[in-house]
UniProtKB/Swiss-Prot annotation:
GO function terms (MF aspect): ATP-dependent peptidase activity; ATPase binding; serine-type endopeptidase activity
InterPro entries xrefs: ClpP, ClpP/crotonase-like_dom_sf, ClpP/TepA, ClpP_Ser_AS
Major enzyme class: hydrolase
Assembly: Fourteen ClpP subunits assemble into 2 heptameric rings which stack back to back to give a disk-like structure with a central cavity, resembling the structure of eukaryotic proteasomes.
Gene3D superfamilies from the UniProt entry: 2-enoyl-CoA Hydratase, Chain A, domain 1 (3.90.226.10)
Localization, UniProt: Cytoplasm
Biological role: Cleaves peptides in various proteins in a process that requires ATP hydrolysis. Has a chymotrypsin-like activity. Plays a major role in the degradation of misfolded proteins.
Database matches in Pfam families: CLP_protease (PF00574)
Protein name (database record): ATP-dependent Clp protease proteolytic subunit 1
């Protein structure tokens, strides 16, 4: 069930679902696995907010176990495409594609709440069918793995060799460890007044 908020104004009361109300404050929330549905929603919201005000930052809050690499790359590319800076904030868990999107925020504007967890690993995949089909899928997974590792290396400043080694298996980090790694820039416990 999606919570409803009531807003009163001189023209009476108006009911909003919580996500629509957050969108008015330029807050986008990824609180589920990355799927085609969630990615399409987030891409649409980012494009809407850019059209609404291309000079005002957007805040992307992430609490996601990850999900579809292709759909996540659609969100990633849109984050890089839109003019406003994207602040990313981990609330709870940013794992797999969730961590990749957390790291994709504007430099200096990637954050985590104090007790969140961040996890990176290599893309998961499976294939079945004829040997040639399996080989095609394996080649695609290796291509995507290299692409994600290169982006992580570029955004964190870590050598590609370390990224390859650390993403070979699940690699969990606390927010302070994620700062040292270069995935985020700061950790906060309380939001400054008048800040989203």
């Amino acid at each position: 069930m999606i919570p409803i908020v009531i807003e009163e104004s001189g023209r009476g009361e108006r009911a909003f679902d919580i996500y629509s109300r957050l969108l008015r404050e330029r807050i986008v929330f990824l609180g589920e696995p990355v799927t085609s549905d969630s990615a399409n929603r987030i891409v649409a919201q980012l494009l809407f907010l850019e059209a609404d005000d291309p000079d005002k930052d957007i805040f992307l809050y992430i609490n996601s176990p990850g999900g579809s690499v292709y759909d996540g790359l659609g969100i990633f590319d849109t984050m890089q495409h839109v003019k406003p800076d994207i602040h990313t904030v981990c609330v709870g868990l940013a794992a797999s594609m969730g961590a990749f999107l957390l790291c994709a925020g504007a430099k200096g504007k990637r954050s985590s709440l104090l007790h969140s967890r961040i996890m990176i690993h290599q893309p998961l995949g499976g294939a079945r069918g004829q040997a040639s089909d399996i080989r095609i899928q394996a080649d695609e997974i290796l291509f995507i793995k290299d692409k994600l590792n290169k982006e992580l290396s570029d955004r964190t400043g870590q050598p590609i060799e370390r990224i390859r080694e650390d993403t070979d298996r699940d690699f969990y980090m606390s927010p302070s460890e994620a700062i040292e790694y270069g995935i985020i820039d700061n950790v906060f416990n309380k939001r400054p007044i008048n800040s989203v």
